[in-house]
Amino acid sequence: MVNRIWEKRFWISCFFIIFLFILVIFQVMVELGRFEKKETKSSTVINIQKQKKPLLKEQSNSRLRHFKDNYPIMLWWSPLTGENGRLGQCGTDTCFFTINRTYLQDPMTKAILFYGTDFNIDSLPLPRKSSHEWALFHEESPKNNYKLFHEPAITLFNHTATFSRHSHMPLTSQYLEGLQALKSTDYLVSVEKKNVLRKRLSPLAYVQSDCDPPSDRDTYVQELMKYIAVDSYGECLHNKDLPQQVNNPSFMDDSQFHHILGQYKFILAFENAVCEDYITEKLWRPLKLGAVPVYFGAPNVEDWLPSNKSAIIVSRFSHPKDLAAYIKKLDKNDTLYMQFIEWKLHGNINNKRLVSAITERKWGVQDVTQDNYIDAFECMVCKRVCENVRLKEQGPSTKLWNADSAHLNCPAPEVFSFLPVHSPKSSMREMWKPSFEQSKKEAKALRTLVERNRNFTTVEFWNLVFKFW
């Protein structure tokens, strides 16, 4: 009798564990699905599209047919540009750019262009012809489409433009207008005035409204707040209000907002993901304003700083308590603090890698005299395709470009252990690690189905994902 009771309890426990496992997997799938269906583009991309300068305006159907019959077609599978047809000049090469999917079977179609955030397994240009090269533009962090950050998925593409320095067109400096923006002293406040302002301001400012991202930054900042005062203006850990006229995300680049932040000695610059070369305005903004960024994000950020002593690197401190003690030390000692501002006062950017990246890139940021990075991406693919067209006319040998895992790669997200085990934190914070693990299976399933080279359904895709568990 005892054995039967024990056996019954054992099977009930097993059933309960299996049920919890399925529940967790279902939650991960739901959350990933939300990101998979995400339709909103970053404001940066939207603004860039408004600035696009086409060689020719959209033409009548008859003229479009004439153009596409004479030039290689670059088909945007993601409707990023919104252009039904445009002839683009790329140096001495010319290509026809369109979002019209009816051109997929056209013999002049040579490249399919994807925007990573919109890359969706629901509809892919399959079967993939041997003459079709795939190109990926993805400037975002992994939270927008995790599956692309694994070797089986990223290597499906021939051409890439990502935040990684290893991609074919690196976008590492995408949030920096230029070297002059770093050197500018328009918002610089003297240390003497900042010391006076400290009577009503905390030493640190934090501005985030995207809470509980893969980097788990809010957990770290929450712990840091136990040891040093932080003025938090965003929705995350909010404790201080901005003036009503700038209390909107659209005002993040407003001069009044910059004047407010420029009054702080230190600004917390925490990325939403920890990936090499993934560096955003969170780093560049305090550097441009003359504040000291307290940075957490790209492990190799020192490769991109304007000076060896221009930012405080969070990863160098074993605990937020130690970081707080160091910031307090600088806050009380003007001589030590000014060592982090010296480069700014003298306009001395001595990082050769940063200087080269800015001066040699083929695109500009908020600069109407230069191509934007989407134009540059289109032209990179266009030039490569045209080069192969010429090589094929001369003989059978053509160039083959391929992405490798370094073109888009991030480690698994980790959470900080400062919080108690049963702390009532959001489920989003706990979701990123299982999402990352599942995305490995998704990347593998995607690769398998694409190599099969015929259309597939979402049911087939998810069945294969579960098969890989």
UniProtKB/Swiss-Prot annotation:
Residues carrying sugar: N100, N158, N308, N333, N455
Keywords of the record: Disulfide bond, Endoplasmic reticulum, Glycoprotein, Glycosyltransferase, Membrane, Signal-anchor, Transferase, Transmembrane, Transmembrane helix
EC category name: transferase
Sample GO molecular function, one term: peptide-O-fucosyltransferase activity
Catalytic activity line of the entry: L-threonyl-[protein] + GDP-beta-L-fucose = 3-O-(alpha-L-fucosyl)-L-threonyl-[protein] + GDP + H(+); L-seryl-[protein] + GDP-beta-L-fucose = 3-O-(alpha-L-fucosyl)-L-seryl-[protein] + GDP + H(+)
GO cellular component, one term: endoplasmic reticulum membrane
Lumenal-side segments: 31-469
Listed pathway(s): Protein modification; protein glycosylation
Keyword Glycoprotein: yes
InterPro entries, A to Z: Alpha-1_3-FUT_met (IPR017176), Glyco_tran_10_C (IPR055270), Glyco_tran_10_N (IPR031481), Glyco_trans_10 (IPR001503), GT10-like_C_sf (IPR038577)
Sequence similarity: Belongs to the glycosyltransferase 10 family.
Protein name per UniProt: GDP-fucose protein O-fucosyltransferase 3
